[in-house]
Amino acid sequence: METVYFNGKFITKEEVKISPDDRGFLFADGVYEVVRWYQGFFYDLNGHMTRLKRSLRELRINWTDTDSFPDFAEKLIKINSLENQTAMVYLQVTRGAARRSHNFPKPDVLPTVYAYAWGFLPEVKLKETGIKAMLKEDIRWSRCDIKSVALLPNTLSFQEAHENGLKECIFVRNGLITEGSHSNIFFVINGTLYTHPESNYVLSGITRKNILRIAEDCGIKIREEAVEENRLRFVQEAFISNTSAEVMPVTELGGNTIGDGVPGPVTRIISDKFDNEINSLKG
Ligand code: PMP
């Protein structure tokens, strides 16, 4: 039986009751986080907590118990017997339930807090071959830095990729490559690692941040600078990053083969160093 966390309680998923007046349901008025459990610990929980607090602040959602998340996330792992597995915890916090109105509820209502955990098998094979992705105009709003649950442009775009047998949709805004529907993207051009800088047009990925740190430690030259779509023919390597895929090579983008069509050497170094870091944390 699956046990979830709902407004301070551990209950079964079937017992969860969310009001139809919940602003998450009516307006997608909420934020989320996803943290990964590596058979004994959450990777960079501090990074996720900092981003969660920022997202809540930007949406002016006042969840006073934010710091309880690490504790109940771990409890969810344990209650659901996932300690010895690779697992994820999803957290969603909405502004709460109040009669539908564009302005925020007055007086304040309590936010709705929901979290659940699940085990999964990492995509080891895909990391060897790399993935193919499509390119598409970035149809999202201009606050992509907030980890908001308003993901319709992301899901519509990802569905398009999925229906075409592709594993990700990479967005292009004003000729510049921003990020994927649920990942950040990196390029290697003449040995230099490029990724879009932190801005309101991308989500500041926790994996992205750690990759930049790892790459710097390896002495790889880094430029946090957007790559123009029309420079893609000069790209030798590409990879996407997120909490579930970690470092995932991209071998084809927008119908064009990247480099030799196989994961490249810089991607491999970064991916190996990332794996080493995880293994060293496992102790
Ligand atoms: N960008 C978007 C739009 C995302 O949805 C995600 C996944 N949450 C990322 C980037 C990667 O973030 P992270 O590395 O923290 O999983």
Regions found by a protein language model. Give the residues of each.
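Conserved alpha/beta cores of soluble small-molecule-handling proteins
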Residues: M1-C169, R173-L176, S199, L212-G283
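Glycine- and Gly-Pro-enriched alpha-helical subdomains that act as flexible
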Residues: L176-E198, S204
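Feature captures the catalytic cores and cofactor-binding loops of soluble hydro-lyases/lyases
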Residues: G205-N210
